[in-house]
Structures are given as structure tokens and as C-alpha cells.
Amino acid sequence: MNCKGLALSLLTVFGTVALQAEDLTPEVTAKFLRILVTSSGQNKIACGDAALKAALEAQGVTVDATSAIVWCTRPVDAKNYKAQGKLVVAGTRDMAGFAGVLITGENGRPKLTINTANLRSAKVTLGDTVMKMGEKVL
């Protein structure tokens, strides 16, 4: 996907999700994850959540347990994946200590938070577009 296509996808996501509830649906989360994995040069993510897996596959994202990008819901798993150099992505603020990227809801809108320290320890590089759209924390 070129930069123009990625920018169009971002506009579509933001326009689509502005009316969502505080807790993000699997479909909304999958749209953000698709942008994230595409920006990294990959098109796959590890994900054990059945509802999110179906939404990811509907977005054309391959769910593969060997991926360097991992969606985590449990801190113990996130800690292990982080130690392996994988990019941990999570949907709750309590995972901020382990996650390189958080996709959360704030005031009914999706919010992308990038933990730059955790991102540096991952063996994944995110594209400039994603880095610009996320709020960075050290």
C-alpha cells in the first residue's frame, strides 16, 4: 500500500469510528491493526482472540502465531512476547508497561498510543504515518 492509499485508509477509519462506543468493537480494532501491520511492511499478526481474529481476516490480515506483531490481552503473555522482541499491541491501558502500541477508546473515539521505549525494544519498525497519528509516551 502506498502512502496515498494508507492516508485514505486512515481517513476512512477515523470517519467510520467516530461514532463508536467507548469500548472499541473488534471491527474497529481490526481496522487499526490492519493499518499498523501494513505500515510495518508485514501483513500478519498473532492473535488469540476469536472475535478479533475473524475481524482481522475480514480486513485481509493474516493471523499467524509466528508474527513479530502480537495482539495481547494478558499481561503475562505481553511480558513474554516483549522479552522475545515482538511488538506487543494491546487494547487496555493496564498493558502500557509491556505494549509498544495501545489502541484504546477515549470519549467514544479510538486513540493510538505509542510507547517509544517498548517500540525500540521490538524487532519491528512502524511507518511514519502511524508514528505521526499516535500519541507518543516515553
Show the residue positions of the predicted features:
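Short hydrophobic alpha-helices and adjacent helix-cap/hinge residues
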Residues: 2-9, 15-138
